[in-house]
Amino acid sequence: MKHRYLPATDQDKKEMLEAIGVERIDELFSDIPESVRFKGEYQIKKAKSETELTKELTKLAAKNKDTVTYASFLGAGVYDHYQPVIVDHVISRSEFYTAYTPYQPEISQGELQAIFEFQTMICELTGMDISNSSMYDGGTALAEAAMLASGHTKKKKIVVSETVHPESREVLKTYAKGQYIDVVEVPSKNGTADLEALDEAVCEDTAAVIVQYPNFFGRIEPLKDIKPIAHKGKSMFIVSANPLALGLLTPPGALGADIVVGDAQPFGIPAAFGGPHCGFFAVTKKLMRKVPGRLVGQTEDENGKRGFVLTLQAREQHIRRDKATSNICSNQALNALAASVAMTALGKKGVKEIAWQNLQKAAYAKEAAKRAGLEVAFEGPMFNEFVIRLNEPVEKANERLLEKNIIGGYDLGASYPDLKRHMLIAVTELRTKEEIDTLMNELGDCHE
C-alpha cells in the first residue's frame, strides 16, 4: 500500500532496488570514491510541532526591519510606495493566483484581458506603440532590450551610461558575454551622462545607447539631447524608466526612444527582500515582431464579441523551439496584474498626484539637508532621489539611524568607488515632514 505522505517507504525502496537489480542503495554511489563520501549524521534539529515551529518562525521574522515600523529612505531601484488595499484582494483570487501561461484563450479570457490592460497602461505611460505582457524585472528587461538591438542592427557594441543602475549593468554584461557583445560604459558628469563622452563612444559598430530616466542618482537625463547621439550611425535608443516618474515626465517615446524598459515595482508590488518584481518592455511598431515575451492582442470571436488571445506566437519557444526570438517562459503575470490593479485604482489623476508628492517631498528633503549643513552632491532636475555627502562612512550613519527607527539611504561607495561617503536618499509619498526632518537632523548632527 502506498503511503499518502512519505515519498519512499521501505517497501517502495525495496521494490525499486529489485527493479534495477541492486541490493543496497549504497551500490548506486559506487562510482564515488570512499574518501570523498560524506559519512555520519546531518546536523538537523529534531522535529517540532506546528505551534512550536510557528512561534520560532515568528520570533525569527521579528528581527526583520520593515517599512511599517521604520521610515524607509532606501530606494536605488526598490521603493516604499503605497499599495492600494484592493491589490491583494484581486491577485489572491484563485483564478489569477494559480494561473499559468494562457495557451487556451477560450478558457483564459480574464487572465488575457488583465494582461492586455497592463500592456495598454504601459504604452500610455511610456508613449510607445507596443508593450509585452511583462519581463522578470527591470534588469533583465534592459538586457533583453540590448539583445534585441544587437540582433536588429546586427552590431556588437552597446554603449551604456554609468548613471544606469549598477546591478542592471551587471545583468547586461552577463547577457552580452554569451553573445560576444562589447559593453562600453560611459562616465557621468555632475550626476548625468557625459554627453561628450557619450558622443565619442558611439560609432558605426554601436547597436544601442542606454540611459536611465530618472537615472540612478535621481537626476533627469536630457533625453532630447541624447537622442541625436544615440541615433548616430543608425544605432538604437534604449531608455530604462521609472514608470511612476512617467506620471509627470515627458514619455520617452515622445523624445525619440526606440525601446523603453523598466520595473513596475512602484505600482502595487512590495519590496519583499528585492523580489519578485515585474519588468516591462515597450517598443515602436517596427520592432513588434522582435519583442521578447508574450503579447496579448484584442480580436473578435465568430459572434462578433471582443476577445483576447496570445498573438504573434511564432516568435516563441513553444512554437519555434531553438529558433525562437523569445525565450521568456513563465513570466511575471501575477505581478503585472498587481501593477495593473494599482494603476487602475489610482487612475490617471492618482498616478500624477503620487508622482507629484514624490517630487515635492524629495525637493523638501533636499532643502532640509542643506539647512542641516549637509552637502548635496549633484544639483539639477530630479524626481524622488538625490545624493548627499557625509563626513562619516554611510554604513556607520545607517547603523545609527536604525536606532531612531529610520532605514537610511543607499551607500553609493559600494558601486562607485569615487563616491565613498555618499548616500543616495529616496523620498516617496509615504514619508512625512517629521520623518524627513528627523533624518536630516540626525545626519546633520554628525556632519558638524
From Swiss-Prot:
Superkingdom to which the source organism belongs: Bacteria
Keyword Oxidoreductase (UniProt): yes
UniProt EC number: 1.4.4.2
Assigned keywords, A-Z: Oxidoreductase
Catalysed reaction equations from the record: N(6)-[(R)-lipoyl]-L-lysyl-[glycine-cleavage complex H protein] + glycine + H(+) = N(6)-[(R)-S(8)-aminomethyldihydrolipoyl]-L-lysyl-[glycine-cleavage complex H protein] + CO2
A GO BP entry: nucleoside metabolic process
GO molecular function: glycine dehydrogenase (decarboxylating) activity
HAMAP family tied to this protein: GcvPA (MF_00712)
Family stated for the protein in its record: Belongs to the GcvP family. N-terminal subunit subfamily.
Role played: The glycine cleavage system catalyzes the degradation of glycine. The P protein binds the alpha-amino group of glycine through its pyridoxal phosphate cofactor; CO(2) is released and the remaining methylamine moiety is then transferred to the lipoamide cofactor of the H protein.
Subunit-structure text: The glycine cleavage system is composed of four proteins: P, T, L and H. In this organism, the P 'protein' is a heterodimer of two subunits.
Name of this protein: Probable glycine dehydrogenase (decarboxylating) subunit 1
Organism (species): Bacillus licheniformis (strain ATCC 14580 / DSM 13 / JCM 2505 / CCUG 7422 / NBRC 12200 / NCIMB 9375 / NCTC 10341 / NRRL NRS-1264 / Gibson 46)
